[in-house]
Amino acid sequence: MKETPEHYPTPEESIATMVTIDDTALVFEGGGMRNAYTAALVSRLIAEGINFPHVSGVSAGSSHLCNFTSRDAQRSHDTFVDLVEDPEFGGLKHFRKGHGYFNAEYIYQQICYPDGALPFNMDAFLANPA
């Protein structure tokens, strides 16, 4: 994935400066690739160290839920901005094979492994109190 010009904090840096907004839940809506717009908000909330006691996500918003809860601002950006350039992401090739336009197995299973295109930090996710 491409590096973004702005430095995003590591999950550890983000957790160290976390501010929790009590009595408020954060819900990420679905919307497929429209969530590329929301990715900037997710990254900014993480960079500012803002946390919520409850976080939920629906459909594509569940990707934001995972990235926000694991405090991975860079992954939040890459999931909806850079990943679309990956040939395995989807397209007509996958659609013609009867798998749908998006390669869901790749997007939601394969990329998150430690050696995948966008490794997921499960330890940071599980350590988040939300």
Residue ranges of predicted features:
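Short, glycine/charge-rich beta-strand/loop segments that flank catalytic centers
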Residues: F95-H99, F125-A130
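A short alpha-helix-loop-beta-strand transition element characteristic
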Residues: P114-P129
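Small-residue-rich anion-binding loops in enzyme active sites
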Residues: M1-D23
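Patatin-like phospholipase
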Residues: D23-T24, G32-D115
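Structural motif
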Residues: A16-M18, A47, A124-F125
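A generic secondary-structure signal marking the coil-to-beta-strand transition
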Residues: D22-T24, P129-A130
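A generic local structural motif
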Residues: E12-S14, V42-S43, L118-N121
